[in-house]
Amino acid sequence: HTATLVHDDVVDESPTRRGIDTINKNWTNSHGILIGDFIYSKAFMLMIGLSDMEILDELSKATNDISKGELIQLGLIGKNDVSIHDLIKVSYFKTGRLFEASAKCGAIFAKKDNKTYINNLSNFSKYLGIAFQIKDDMLDYSLNSKQLGKPTLQDLSEGKITYPFYFALKNANVKDKKFLLSILGSKKHYKNSKIIEKIELLGGIKQTEKLLKSY
């Protein structure tokens, strides 16, 4: 999990995480990539100690899927025709898959022969992970940088559509849609409060909360 966050900070060029400077801010992106790789390899070394190929298989597949999620999200940057299916897919691969694999590996280790137990815990954790990502996207439009522990609206400035923006865009009239698309990926300085107010006004937060509750 830590490795994915370190790499995610490099991809997003995030200066802070949990209220402190990121590795790439303190040093360079190269440091972030190498330290992330080091942590990944350490995780696999620890898993090898369990001598369980099923756990190793799950961990390696999850690592591959998480990278896939980052690539899918990068491919959606700047696109204004992103669907809810696209967003759920990214949430699953980037976050849900990590939750799912973590729970599944623990379940395999604890009750290897109980397939129903393993599957139920895996599915629960998958949906919990997707819900976590939806909540994280919602908080980006609800809290300030200090409360969030990282810069707010960073996805928006990078041209990444998240749930609140998606729903607001879907509900917008021609004038509001023009404004929303003008700030997507824009390097111009806009007041965060103005953007958040517009997203709220268009039902972006409310509909995201409704989606969150469905998970």
Q: Where is each model-derived feature located?
A:
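All-alpha prenyltransferase/terpene-synthase fold signal
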Residues: 1-215
